[in-house]
């Protein structure tokens, strides 16, 4: 694969066994064009403390998921872990209490390695493994992880996550 840096006029050839391409991501224009955005962020995300999810300038503003400036992957797994932190901290702020809930950067990415195997890359802000399934090594490709992606995660999304139960 060739990686080209158009601004520097350079390119490098890089070999790989597995290529995981992440598309460019940014906040919507209405956030990018607002004062809540992080000033030095070209992607225009809402400027939040990465652990409390509270805005760094306006304490009544919280953000999570694809809109927040947390320095982690923008994944469904991340927002699933951010939502309870935001709710706890928002309620604490409304009651003038200290914000004690903390988001540690958990994110997850299911990586399909064949037609019937997958591994589940789970990590935190330090980019260290952060496994969430007890007794199962999700860092190596497994058939049961493929079944999780194919059947378990869609069911979890539609029946639990969207209803605030997971």
Predicted segment positions?
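Internal hydrophobic alpha-helix adjacent to the cofactor/substrate pocket in enzyme cavities
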Residues: 79-105, 111
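C-terminal auxiliary extensions adjacent to catalytic cores
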Residues: 120-166
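A structure-centric signal for secondary-structure junctions around beta-strands
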Residues: 58, 105-106
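FAD-binding beta-loop-beta segment adjacent to the flavin cofactor pocket
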Residues: 44-62, 113-133
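Short, electropositive alpha-helical surface patch
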Residues: 75-85, 117-122
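FAD-site-proximal beta/loop scaffold in flavoenzymes
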Residues: 16-81, 91-92
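Conserved beta-strand-loop-beta-strand element in the redox core of flavoprotein oxidoreductases
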Residues: 1-13
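Central beta-strand plus flanking loop segment that forms part of the substrate or channel wall
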Residues: 29-31, 107-112
